[in-house]
Amino acid sequence: HIHAQLVYRDASNFPLLGRATESAGARYERFPDSLKNISRAPLWNLSRNSAGMAIRFRSNSTTIAAKWVALFNTHMNHMTDTGAKGLDLYCLQKNGDWRFVNSARPKGKTNQVTIIKNMHPEEREYMLYLPLYDGLVSLSIGVDSLATISQPLVDYPIRKNPVVFYGTSILQGGCASRPGMAHTNIISRRLNRECINLGFSGNAFLDLEVAKVIAEVEASVFVLDFVPNA
C-alpha cells in the first residue's frame, strides 16, 4: 500500500480570521506594532496570543496535517496544552454547520501532527483554529502531494461587519479544552460570522490602546465583558 507523501504549505497563503487590525507586525498577533512600547507589558505579551484566530482553506486531500512552532511554549497546570498551544480543525457541512474534525495536540514548542487521514478525496472547506494562550512563530498545513489546497470558495464565517469581543481570561478562552471551544469561537460557528477575540487574561482594565484597536473595526456588535477584572 503506497502512502502519498505530505506537502506542507505556509498558512500565511490563506485567509486569517479573527484579527482586529491588518497592521499587526507579526501575522498571528492581535495588536499593531505601534503599541509595543505604549501598552503595559502584560497586555502586550497577551496580545501576542492568537486567541480567536483561524485559518480558512479548501482541500481535497485524504490527509490534513500541521506543523507549527509555538511562540512562548506555554504550559499551565489548570488548562490543557491542546487548548493553550494546540490547533483545532473544523469542516463545513453542506447545511452550513461546522463539524469538529480533530485537534492537533502539541508535544512542545515545535510540533508536527497528522490531524486526520484516510478521508475520501473530495473538496471540503476547512477552518483551523489557532492557540488560545500562546502565539505562533510559524504554521504550515500538510496535504497529500497530489492533492490541492486552495483559497476558500465559501464566505463562511461571513467576514463583513464582524462581532468584536473584549474581556478577561474567560473570554480569551481559559480554560477551554481545545481552541474551538472558546466561547467566541463557538458563537462564530453558530452565527457563521467572524468574531474577533480581544480577551486578555487578568488584564481587562479598559486600556485606551485596546479601545483604539477596537475602533478600527467596522463591527456589527461590540461585546464588552471586562467586569470580572474591573
Mark where each language-model region is:
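N-terminal secretory targeting modules
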Residues: 1-162
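Conserved SGNH/GDSL esterase-like catalytic core that processes O-acyl groups on lipids
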Residues: 82, 110-113, 118-125, 131-140, ...
